[in-house]
Amino acid sequence: MVLKASVNSFRKIFGWGVLSFFCSQIAYGVSVDTKSYDPFCGVGVKVAGKTLVIGWDTPEGSTELTLNLSGQGALVRSVAVASGKGKVIEVVRDINPVTVLTVGQRDLNKRSGWTIFFDRTSRKPSESGPLTLKLKSAIVRSVGKRCMVDLGELHGESFSGKLRFTIYAGCDLIHLQSVVQTNQDARALLYHAGLTCDPTGKTVSWIGLDDKVHQVSADMQPAEPEKVRHRTIALETEAGSLAVFPPPHRYFYPLDEAYNLGFTWRGNDFMNHVSGFGIGIRQALEGDRRWVPWSNAPPGTKQELGVFWLPSTARGQQLFDRVKAYTHGDRFVEVPGHKTFTSHYHIEHTTRLLESREKQQGSVADEVVNTSRREGQDWRYSLRQPPKDWIQSSFDDQKWKKGKGGFGKKGTPGLRLGTDWNTQDIWLRRTFKLKETPRDKLKLSLLYDEDTEVYLNGVLAASVKGFSKTYREVPINPEALKTLKKGDNLLAVHCWNDGGGQAIDVGLVRPMKISRPREMPTPEFVSVFKKAGVDIVHLAEFHNRLGRDRRNPDKALPLLKLLHDECIRLSDKDFLLLPGEEPNVHLGGHWISFFPRPVMWVLNRAKDKPFVEMHPKYGRVYHVGSPADVLKLMEREGGLMWAAHPRIKSSTGFPDLYREEPFFKSDRYLGGAWKAMPADLSKPRLGERVLDLLDDTANWGAKKYIVGEVDIFQVDRTTEFYAHANINYLRLDHIPRFEDGWAPVLKALQDGAFFISTGEVLMPRFTIGGKQSGQTLKLVASRQAQLEVELSWTFPMSFAEVITGDGKEVYRKRIDLTETGAFGKQTLKKTLDLRGKTWVRLEAWDVAANGIISQPVWLE
C-alpha cells in the first residue's frame, strides 16, 4: 500500500493547516528544526505553546501524539485516538518513555572479532542504568510517508545519542527508538524499554501462556517480569489502551533455547533504575543460562533500541488482535504455490521416548543413597583442585566446605538448588552407609551439567560428558560395583562446566520391575509447529549425550529406527516430520544431513567394515568414516548436506576452509544455514554473516544456497518459538507423504526454489528476466533484464536491495520503500543492468528488521 498525503484530514484533526509550518519554531526555549519536514509525508506537525503536536490518519480513524518540550514533567503530554470520523479522545496522559541499558563485555579474542556465539557475557561484570534525556534539541524531518522527531540529548552507561519518535502515515504504530552509540570497544548490550505513568485508575493487561486475557489493577507493587504471548503488555484506561511490544525478531539475540523468560514487565521501580510505576519489555540478563552472548555494540555504531506503542480506543482482546496482526498471530501464513519448511531442531524426542520406554519396560528408581531432588543431602566440596588421593576413603576432607546438594546455578533445568556453584570445576565427597552388601545391580542417579566423573570407594564408577536436563540412571562400572560393602562407603565426584547451565547431584538407585501400559502421546512440539503454520519440519537429533552412540552400530541403528518410526507416526497429510542430524565429524565443523527417505547409517567405519552391508534386521546400512564416504553416501541416496551455523559457533572457519574439497564442490553440498546470529541492533538486516557467505560462494563460482535454520532445543507450548524462528517457503504444490518419500523437498532446496522469511514480509513471486531463483538466465546483447517482484508486508517497509556479483566484487542497489505504509502489497518492476555480472538476488526489509531473502538467479 503506497499512501498519499491527505492535508485536509490533518486540518480536520488539528483545526489548522500544516502547510504553514516552515523552517523552525520555538517551543518556549527549545528550537524545533523543521527544515527537512514535508507536510505531504502524510503526518501533520505543529508547535502549540510548549508542545509539539503530531497527527495522522490510521485504520481506526486518527491518532494525535502531543510531546511536552518544556523540559518539565512527562515528555508525552497525551496520546489521543479518534474512531472513524468521531472526536479525538485522550487515551493516556502524562507518560514518560523509559529505556534501561545493560552493558557487558565482548570477548574479541576468542573468535578474532565480533562474529561470536560462545561468549559468557552474562557471567562477566556488567552495568545497568537508564538512558536520561536532557532536552536540548528537537528535529522534525520526513522521509517518504513517515515523520521522525529526534530529541537530544540522550546519555547513559557510556552511550549517547537521541530519542526518536517515528510515525508512519496511515499506520496505528508509534515507533520509539533510543538511537545511541559508544566510543568504548568490546561492548555487548541488552536493553529494556517501556513507559512510566501515574497508575491511578489504570489497569494492565496481557495474554498469558494459557492464551487468555489477564487484567490487573495498576499499582505500586515492585516491578516483576510477566510471561506473555505475543511479547505484548498493555496499559488500559477508561478511554482506551496503549499496547507496548518489541520488534518481533530483532529484539531477541540468539540462544540455544527459546524459553519464555518473561519478556515484559509491570510495576514499580523496575530494575531499581526506573522511578514510579510502569510497563514495558525486558530481557533476562542470564538468558537460558547456557551461552548468552547478548547483542554486539561495536564502537561508533548507532544502536537502535526500539519499542512499538499501539494506542487504541479498544481494550482487551480487540487491542491484542490489532497487535497480533503484525505477525499474523505468530503464524507463517500460506503463500500460493509454496509450502513452509523449517530446519535444525534438537528436540531430543527420540531420546526422551527411549528413556520412557525403558521405564515402561522395566524400572522405576528406588533410591538406596538419596539424591537431592527432594531434599538436600550433605556433601563436602572444594572449588580448588585437590591432591590425587582425594577419591580415597583415607583422604581427610575436614578442611573442605560443607554444602547441601544439588550444586549449581539457579534456573538450571532439573536442579533443586542447595548450594551455589559458579566456578569451572567442583570436587565433592560424601560418605554413606549400607546396611548390607547390595545383591542387586545398583545404578547411579545422576544430574549433571557438564562433564562428570563419579568414583565409588576410589574406583571410577562412571564418566559422562555433556549435560542432562533430568536425572539419568547410569550403569556402574562392575569393578566399582564390587567395592560396595556393608557399613561406610564413599562417593567422590568431579564436575567440569564451561558455561551456561550448571548442575551436579548424585545418588544410588535400585531398578525395580514394574508394569505400565504403553502410551504413545503426541508431543507438544507437533501442535506448536502446526499452530505456527509450519508444514514440514527437518530435525537435527542426537546432538546430545547420544551423539557418540551414533558411531556404535549396536546403539546407532536402534536409535535411527526409533527416529524414523516416530517421524512417520507423527506425520499426517498436513504435516511432515522428517529425520535429520547435525554431525560434527568427518567434514569439518558441524553440518546437517538430509535424505529423501529413511537411511540407516553409522558415523564411523571400523577397519574391517565395508562401506555398505546388508543387516539382517535393518537392511542396507552404511558405515562412513571419511569425507569421501560421506560424499559417496549422499550420491547413492540422493541426500544433501550443508554447513550448520557457518562461520560461527563450532563451524567457525567453515565452509571456507574446505571450499576446494570434492564434497563441497559436489551438487550434494547445498551451502549454509541462515540464522540471525550474532545480533547487532545497528544493522537494518538480520543475519549478515550468512548473507555474506551466500555472496562469497556465488563469487567463488559455486552454485550454493542458504536455508533458514532455527537451531534450538526445546519446543513446547511455553516457549517463545516465533521470536526465534524463521521459515523457508519452498516452491511445492503439495506436502509429500512420509511413506512415499520426500524427494520433492530436497529437490526444491537443491534447485534454489525457495525464499527465506521472518514471517512478516512475503514474496509470492520473484523473477529476473522471467527466471525464478535457482534458474539460469541467458542475458541478451544489452545485458539488461527486468526485475519483477511481488511483495506483501505487515510493518511498513524500509527498503529492498538488489545484490549482484561478478566473481570478485559484490554490488548493492537499494530500492527505497519509505512510501509504503502498514499491511500493504506492491509489485516492483525495475530494469537491471547486469553487464559483467554472474549472479543476482534480492532482499527486502521492513522498519522492524523483518524481511525476505531470495536465492540467486544465475547469469550467463
Model-derived regions, located:
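C-terminal functional module detector
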Residues: 83-84, 89-129, 138, 280, ...
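Beta-strand-rich ligand-recognition modules
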Residues: 447, 453-508, 822-826
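Acidic, contiguous internal or C-terminal segments within carbohydrate-active enzymes
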Residues: 63-69, 137-203
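Beta-strand-rich recognition/accessory modules
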Residues: 232-337
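Extended carbohydrate-recognition surfaces in non-catalytic/accessory domains of CAZymes
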Residues: 363-440, 470-474, 495-497, 502-505, ...
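Acidic-aromatic substrate-binding/catalytic surfaces of carbohydrate-active enzymes
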Residues: 33, 48-136, 146, 377-396, ...
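A metal-dependent hydrolase metal-coordination microenvironment
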Residues: 350-363, 513-638, 643-644, 650-654, ...
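Aromatic-lined ligand-binding clefts that engage carbohydrates, nucleic acids, or primary amines
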Residues: 194, 400, 424, 432-458, ...
